[in-house]
Design a protein with these regions (language model features):
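Conserved ABC ATPase signature
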Residues: 152-156, 160
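A short, proline-enriched helix->beta-strand linker immediately N-terminal to the Walker B motif
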Residues: 171-175, 181
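Conserved ABC transporter NBD signature motif
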Residues: 58-71, 124
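Hydrophobic anchor residue at the start of the ABC signature
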Residues: 166
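ABC ATPase NBD coupling module
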Residues: 67-89, 127-129
Length: 182
């Protein structure tokens, strides 16, 4: 069973066709590298997978479920797009860490915001937040940054910032992890 299938994915910007019918599948545990010249559409493909850009044509299937079909999903709502994005963890080329937050807070922020939408959040706030913090600490430890969890991005090397970005992406427990220019 493929964890990800992309079928005939196209993306146009006006009359410029950037993605020209991309097809591939990815099995659980596999790694896939896209190699191409600058401007060939690698980042655009990742942005389409994560719905930062809306594909012009094609299908995206995750765990045998169609999450995007250009013919049927012209008007995906914000809630559905957010739900679809949870399948993909993104590590951006420039890492996109929040400079005003520590490494730990960069990792936990999205989960904290999502937790506030839980119906049991008010009654269990401390427990939920403690669990999220513990998971963030464990992920930072797993990428070798336990001692740096209270550092701000400007206090970290580029490689350390990248590892924070990886831990942040893993916090949402995505099905697929995408790296732009690792």
């Amino acid at each position: 069973m493929s964890i990800l299938e992309v079928k005939n994915l196209k993306k146009n910007f006006g009359s410029l066709e950037v993605l020209k019918g991309i097809d591939f599948s990815l099995e659980k545990g596999e790694a896939l590298a896209m190699i191409g010249a600058s401007g060939s559409g690698k980042t655009t493909l990742l942005r389409c997978l994560n719905f930062l850009e809306r594909p012009t044509h094609g299908q995206i299937i995750v765990n045998d479920k169609i999450i995007f079909d250009a013919d049927d999903n012209k008007s995906l709502g914000d809630a559905q797009i957010r739900k679809n994005r949870l399948h993909f963890g993104m590590v951006f080329q420039s890492f996109n860490l929040f400079p005003q937050y520590t490494a730990l807070r960069n990792c936990t922020l999205a989960r904290e915001l999502m937790a506030k939408e839980r119906p049991d959040f008010k009654e269990n706030k401390k427990k939920i937040m403690d669990e999220i913090t513990a998971e963030g600490e464990a992920l930072l430890e797993s990428v070798g940054l336990k001692e740096k969890m209270n550092y701000y991005p400007h206090q970290l090397s580029g490689g350390q910032q990248q590892r924070v970005a990886i831990a942040r992406a893993l916090m949402l427990q995505p099905d697929i992890l995408c790296f732009d220019e690792p």
